[in-house]
A protein has these predicted regions:
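Catalytic phosphate/metal-binding cores of nucleic-acid and nucleotide-processing enzymes, i.e., regions
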Residues: 1-108
Length: 108
């Protein structure tokens, strides 16, 4: 997971996307990273390849979404680049669709 996160962060920076590690003392299961570009904020959970978010992480993602936030998760570099390209080039509709589709898949 750490190697994938490092690669994603390097890629985001190469696109001029601001990123920070997200921690919230007293709150578990928050997404790993915050990415910001063009006034759009994206929370992203980064998983080990083949792994999915825990129920607690899915719950936290649902809370973020319920207040209008954009949040998703990835377990590979290809999916991460799709999220980041959408963020960088303000493809907001695509970004929202990606986030919404993931959440629908997880609730099925």
């Amino acid at each position: 997971e750490a190697q994938l996160e490092k690669k994603i962060v390097q890629f985001a920076k190469s696109l001029g996307i601001y990123t920070r590690k997200f921690t919230s003392p007293g709150h578990r299961a928050v997404p790993d990273r915050i990415f910001v570009s063009g006034g759009i904020v994206l929370f992203l959970e980064i998983k080990t390849p083949g792994k999915k978010p825990t129920q607690a992480q899915l719950h936290e993602m649902a809370l973020i979404t319920s207040v209008g936030g954009l949040v998703g998760w990835v377990d590979n570099f290809t999916d991460a680049t799709a999220f980041l390209f959408s963020l960088r080039y303000k493809l907001t509709a695509d970004l929202k669709r990606r986030c919404k589709n993931q959440q629908q898949e997880e609730t099925q």
